[in-house]
C-alpha cells in the first residue's frame, strides 16, 4: 500500500512538473516615457522596470537627458514612493528596478542610495535595485551597499570580475544582428546571438538585449533562445502574449498518415457518390498550420482540385458555422443560427439532394 502511494505521489509530481509554465520575464524599457510611468508596467506584470535618472541640484530627475528635465518628474515621486506605498499595503511583488544613470556615475549613485534608504526600501527582499547606464568600474562594484547591484554590459570580462554584485548582463542587440523581428534571423547572426546568451548563462547570470526588435515574433524567438529579460516598450502587451505562449504553441510529436488518392476514374463517367465535407472555421491559416505541423503534407492537400469559399450571413457580417455550412451546402445565404433553411426559415435542398435528383 505504501509503495502504491509513493508511486502515485511520484507520478503526480512528474505530471505537475511537466505542466509547469516557463515564467518569461519582460523588461519595461524606457518606462518613464509611458503615459503612466511605473504603474502601467507594474500592473501589466513586468518583472523589470527601467527608469533613466539625471542628478541636478541634488535632485534625481527622471529623464533621458538634462535638457528634457521636467521638475515634477523625480525618482522619488514616480518610482520610490509608489514602491513604498505597495510595500506598506502588503501588495508589493518581486520586482527589479533598473536605474539607468545619465549623469555622473559616482555622485548620482550616492544620491540614489540615499533616496532608497530614505524610503526604507533598502532591506525589502522583493525589490532588486540594479544600476545601469553610467556605472563605476566593475572593480568598484563591491564598494556599494548590498542592496545595490549592477547591470554589467561586457561579455568579455565575466571571468575576471567579482560577479556577486552583478544582477544581469545586458548588451546592445544591434552589435549582433540586424534582424527586424519579422521572419527568421539569418544563420550567422543567430549564431552570434546564441553565443552572447551562452556567455552570460555560463556564469549563471540572467541576460538581456537592449535595442532589440519589439514584435510578437521577436518576443517568441527571444523566449525560445533563453533571453531572461525580454526588452519591450509595450510591457503589458508582451507579458500578456508570453503568458500564454506555451499553451498556444503546439508541437506535433507523431505525424499523421496521409491518404494518397490514386485518381483511377474515367472523367467521362457520372459520379456515383459525392462526399461533402464542411470544415468549421477551417481557412488557409488552419490548413497551413496543420500542414506545417504534419511535415508539410495533409490528406486535403493531395486533392488535385482545391478551392475556397467565403460567405457572410444575411443578418451579420460575421458568419457562424450554421449559416456558413448552410450556404455552402445549399448555395443559399441564410441568417446565423440557421441550419438547412433560408432566411425565412423554409427548408432548403442541399447539394447532395439536388445532384441525386431528390
Where are these regions (language model features)?
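Phosphate-group recognition and catalysis centered on beta-loop-alpha active-site segments
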Residues: 19-263, 270-273, 285-287
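Short secondary-structure capping/junction motifs at helix and strand boundaries
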Residues: 2-4, 17, 122-126, 358
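N-terminal catalytic scaffold of extracellular/periplasmic and nuclease hydrolases
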Residues: 252-358
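Short acidic/polar alpha-helix capping motifs at helix-coil junctions
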Residues: 3-4, 180-188, 314-318
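Short glycine-rich, polar/acidic loop-and-turn segments at beta strand-coil junctions
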Residues: 10, 53-55, 66, 103, ...
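Alpha-helical transmembrane segments and their juxtamembrane interfaces
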Residues: 12-13, 62, 290
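Bacterial Sec-dependent N-terminal signal peptides
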Residues: 1-22
Amino acid at each position: 500500500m505504501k509503495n502504491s502511494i509513493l508511486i502515485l505521489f511520484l507520478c503526480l509530481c512528474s505530471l505537475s512538473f511537466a505542466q509547469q509554465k516557463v515564467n518569461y520575464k519582460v523588461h519595461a524599457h524606457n518606462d518613464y516615457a509611458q503615459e503612466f510611468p511605473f504603474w502601467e508596467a507594474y500592473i501589466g506584470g513586468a518583472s523589470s522596470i527601467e527608469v533613466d535618472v539625471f542628478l541636478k541640484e541634488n535632485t534625481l530627475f527622471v529623464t533621458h537627458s538634462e535638457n528634457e528635465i521636467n521638475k515634477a518628474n523625480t525618482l522619488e515621486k514616480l518610482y520610490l514612493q509608489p514602491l513604498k506605498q505597495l510595500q506598506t499595503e502588503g501588495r508589493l511583488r518581486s520586482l527589479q528596478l533598473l536605474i539607468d544613470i545619465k549623469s555622473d556615475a559616482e555622485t548620482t549613485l550616492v544620491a540614489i542610495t540615499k533616496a532608497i534608504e530614505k524610503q526604507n526600501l533598502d532591506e525589502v527582499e522583493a525589490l532588486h535595485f540594479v544600476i545601469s547606464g553610467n556605472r563605476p568600474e566593475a572593480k568598484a562594484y563591491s564598494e556599494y551597499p548590498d542592496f545595490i547591484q549592477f547591470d554589467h554590459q561586457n561579455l568579455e570580462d565575466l571571468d575576471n570580475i567579482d560577479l556577486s554584485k552583478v544582477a544581469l548582463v545586458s548588451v546592445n542587440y544591434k552589435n549582433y544582428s540586424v534582424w527586424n523581428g519579422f521572419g527568421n534571423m539569418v544563420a550567422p547572426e543567430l549564431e552570434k546571438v546564441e553565443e552572447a546568451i551562452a556567455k552570460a548563462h555560463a556564469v549563471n547570470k540572467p541576460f538581456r538585449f537592449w535595442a532589440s526588435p519589439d514584435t510578437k515574433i521577436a518576443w517568441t524567438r527571444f523566449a525560445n533562445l533563453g533571453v531572461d529579460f525580454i526588452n519591450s516598450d509595450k510591457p503589458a502587451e508582451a507579458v500578456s502574449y508570453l503568458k500564454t505562449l506555451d499553451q498556444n504553441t503546439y508541437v506535433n510529436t507523431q505525424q499523421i498518415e496521409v491518404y494518397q488518392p490514386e485518381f483511377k476514374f474515367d472523367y467521362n463517367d457520372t459520379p456515383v457518390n459525392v462526399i461533402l465535407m464542411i470544415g468549421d472555421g477551417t481557412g488557409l491559416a488552419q490548413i497551413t498550420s496543420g500542414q506545417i505541423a504534419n511535415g508539410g503534407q495533409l490528406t486535403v492537400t493531395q486533392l488535385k482540385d482545391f478551392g475556397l469559399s467565403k460567405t457572410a450571413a444575411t443578418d451579420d457580417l460575421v458568419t457562424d458555422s450554421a449559416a456558413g455550412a448552410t450556404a455552402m451546402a445549399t448555395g443559399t445565404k441564410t441568417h446565423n443560427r440557421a441550419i438547412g433553411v433560408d432566411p425565412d426559415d423554409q427548408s432548403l435542398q442541399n447539394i447532395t439532394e439536388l445532384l441525386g435528383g431528390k
